[in-house]
A protein has these predicted regions:
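Inter-lobe coupling/hinge segments of SF2-like helicase ATPases
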Residues: 208-210, 217-219, 223-226
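Short, intrinsically disordered, charge-balanced linker/junction segments flanking boundaries
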Residues: 227-232
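Active-site and donor-binding regions of nucleotide-sugar-utilizing enzymes
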Residues: 19-22, 26-40, 44-215
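Membrane-interacting alpha-helical segments
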Residues: 3-21
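Absolute protein N-terminus
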Residues: 1-2, 164
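Alpha-helical structural motif
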Residues: 2-5, 9, 31, 182, ...
Length: 232
């Protein structure tokens, strides 16, 4: 498809530019030596066909923590790799001994191919709405199922995507194994875009399952301030 090809070319050209911009920005130092992971450069080793959870930053990570904990309790022998796009999100995984963290690759064909071919995940579980066409296409070529958890889609966004329904499904919708939505409205909005009903279910927001205590509230406020600093 022509739009898919255009997207690949554009992201291949822009990825090095975005990488350099992040590297030399004020927040670049927060990534440390691991900033090269944004280009898919993770260590060469056996990752044991892990289940891969992606949470873009603080909010998604906080919502995913109970799910990841329950997954580990149910399958303690299964290796878990988690990715975030920001250092503040990464910090929330720092004390979880049963997960391995990496920064998610930029959505360029080369970066996602390098990353996924080294990782060899058995499945990818994405929190909320972090959907990248090159990554989804690469995982489809490797027969890796992708699940969207805590999925949300506003009526406004659904109406906008509906104008390119065929393109949306070619680049994104067809690549998803299952979408577990927050609300009935979210489910209906995804269905309007052509997602088959058998791929859709409702769980409610995982963020309501967070075990909130004063320490976590304080931590959340701290990371919220850090996140604002990153954007400046």
């Amino acid at each position: 498809m022509i739009l898919s090809l255009i997207y690949k070319v554009v992201t291949a050209v822009l990825a090095p530019v975005i990488y350099q911009k992040i590297r030399f920005s004020a927040k670049g130092n927060a990534y440390g030596e691991r900033i090269n992971e944004l280009l898919g450069n993770i260590p060469e080793k056996d990752y044991h066909s892990p289940v891969w959870f992606h949470t873009v930053s603080v909010g998604e990570t906080m919502g995913a923590l109970p799910l990841i904990k329950k997954f580990h309790e149910r399958w303690p022998d299964k290796h878990i790799v988690v990715t975030t796009s920001t250092p503040t999100g990464a910090a929330l995984y720092k004390n979880l001994s049963y997960v391995e963290h990496h920064y998610a690759p930029l959505d360029s064909p080369i970066a996602v191919k390098k990353f996924t071919e080294k990782l060899k995940p058995s499945a990818l579980i994405i929190m909320e709405t972090e959907l990248w066409p090159n990554l989804l296409q690469e995982l489809e070529s490797q027969d890796v199922p992708v699940y969207l958890i805590n999925a949300r889609l506003s009526e406004r966004s659904a109406s906008r995507y509906a104008m390119l329904k065929s393109t949306f499904n070619t680049l994104i919708g067809d690549k998803l194994k299952m979408l577990i939505c927050q609300t009935v409205d979210d489910r209906n909005n995804f269905e309007k875009l052509g997602i088959p009903p058998n791929k859709l279910s409702i769980s409610g927001s995982l963020k309501f399952d967070i075990d909130v205590n004063p320490e976590k509230i304080a931590l959340g406020k701290k990371f919220k301030k850090l996140r604002k600093t990153e954007k400046n």
